């Protein structure tokens, strides 16, 4: 115990002497001071993958934090509802988030301008209004699809009656109404039969089924009946009805007049064979697959 106390006393004395020791400075004239570092953003390393770069129009390549009016796409217009109705869910989902990203960039720029009270943001606000309108229309297009799908599930028993009524209205529609009816037909064939609006949206293994074949027959004969009603002179030249999926498919992929010409060529060449049930799905998958590949090849050439 005695040795322990002596060590503590010695330790305390050392600290006391250290505190009371006179301070000595070297020659201050020999000390070299570095130049002060001017505060600048260049002194900081920011990762090029930092998420906040998403709030700038050109990402980590952006040279300014605020775009002037001339840098904005003020000549653009909102997407129309008919245009959005033709898009797949994946396209609408992607478009929604691209718009959301642009709106976030605009909101940051407006907030920055407000803090300085020196820059006009009228163009930014006008562009944001256009983007907001497009988002509202995307919601409307999705709601229409959901409602159409739910209605199909609830009144399956009335499908035949509804399709019959639509067929009569479509065939007898005026030329001024046919554009609207064609848009309705696109929604109808998707809601009732799962026929996608765009070729590239097809999953050939899953989408080609009995419902698809039924829808193909309905759409093809519907377009043919309207064409013949509008062109009575063609009734004698073109024999009806259509002879299975081989003759029906052109009406889904092409304009009615082009489809009729193609069917006539098939008939003249003897290629308009009637397929057995087991051959229908493979034929459709193969034909649609070739059409999709041709469309991709054409886009690459452009």
Swiss-Prot record:
Sorted alphabetically, the keyword list is: Mitochondrion, Ribonucleoprotein, Ribosomal protein, Transit peptide
GO MF annotations in UniProt: structural constituent of ribosome
Which GO cellular component term is one of those annotated? mitochondrial large ribosomal subunit
**Coiled-coil portions:** none
Tell me where it resides: Mitochondrion
Look up the record and give one Gene Ontology term from the biological process aspect. mitochondrial translation
Supply the InterPro entries for this chain.
MRP-L47_sf, Ribosomal_uL29_mit
- Give the record's family classification: Belongs to the universal ribosomal protein uL29 family.
What PANTHER family does the record point to?
Answer: LARGE RIBOSOMAL SUBUNIT PROTEIN UL29M (PTHR21183:SF18), RIBOSOMAL PROTEIN L47, MITOCHONDRIAL-RELATED (PTHR21183)
Name this protein carries in UniProt: Large ribosomal subunit protein uL29m
Q: Which organism is it from?
A: Debaryomyces hansenii (strain ATCC 36239 / CBS 767 / BCRC 21394 / JCM 1990 / NBRC 0083 / IGC 2968)
